[in-house]
Amino acid sequence: MKRSAINDILGHTRQFFSQHDVHLPPFASFSPAQWQQLDTAAWEEVFDLKLGWDVTAFGRNNFAAHGLTLFTLRNGSAKGMPYVKCYAEKIMHVRDAQVTPMHFHWRKREDIINRGGGNLIVELWNADSNEQTADSDITVVIDGCRQKHTAGSQLRLSPGESICLPPGLYHSFWAEAGFGDVLVGEVSSVNDDDHDNHFLQPLDRYNLIDEDEPAQLVLCNEYRQFR
């Protein structure tokens, strides 16, 4: 991805969040120069847990079709130490018709919440013993209501609705085409993007970046430059 595209994406997402009255912590606005001036030891939790901005096209070259913009607000250590929080929270911007590819988590249990905008479509499959999609019915809980659906069902979440996804359940999601972008919340157990994501089709979690212009903000996988 080009840095200029990432700058534009983040600018658009910040506007979208503002339209939905979403307020982020101050470090969401820190430029690279501001990060350079900080006492990095005081910010180790942000660095270690990859709090902050994340822009990905999942290693592909078409962000509009396959991509996601998110901000991790809080998280804990995967093994419980040194950061003892047992929960995580993200806020996400899913653009109209933009797909997050099919994947599951080995350990993370998460609630995906449509906080506003258009409709969110979630496609669900059980994983078989070979980590492929299974033909068995899936069972999920939507806003406290336990439901059974056929394999590969695509469930529509309108604003205000949420779904609980257990570990090992394949899921892909996108904003329903023609209904606009979606503000998505995620509340979960500890998030570990380095070790707890399994994609049905192997892909890269982060994109290589072509530095065609200066970065306006810092992504969560770029903090190493400040340590």
Swiss-Prot record:
Changing residue 186 to A: Loss of activity. Sugar isomerase that catalyzes the reversible isomerization of D-lyxose to D-xylulose, and D-mannose to D-fructose. Shows similar activity toward D-lyxose and D-mannose with a turnover and catalytic efficiency for D-lyxose as a substrate only 1.1- and 1.3-fold higher than those for D-mannose, respectively. Shows weaker activity with L-gulose, D-talose, L-ribose and L-allose. Overexpression enables cell growth on the rare pentose D-lyxose as the sole carbon source. Its EC number is 5.3.1.15, 5.3.1.7. The lineage of its organism: Bacteria, Pseudomonadati, Pseudomonadota, Gammaproteobacteria, Enterobacterales. Belongs to the D-lyxose ketol-isomerase family. Changing residue 90 to A: Retains 0.7% of wild-type activity. This is D-lyxose/D-mannose isomerase. D-fructose binds at residues 90, 103-110, 171, 186, 193.
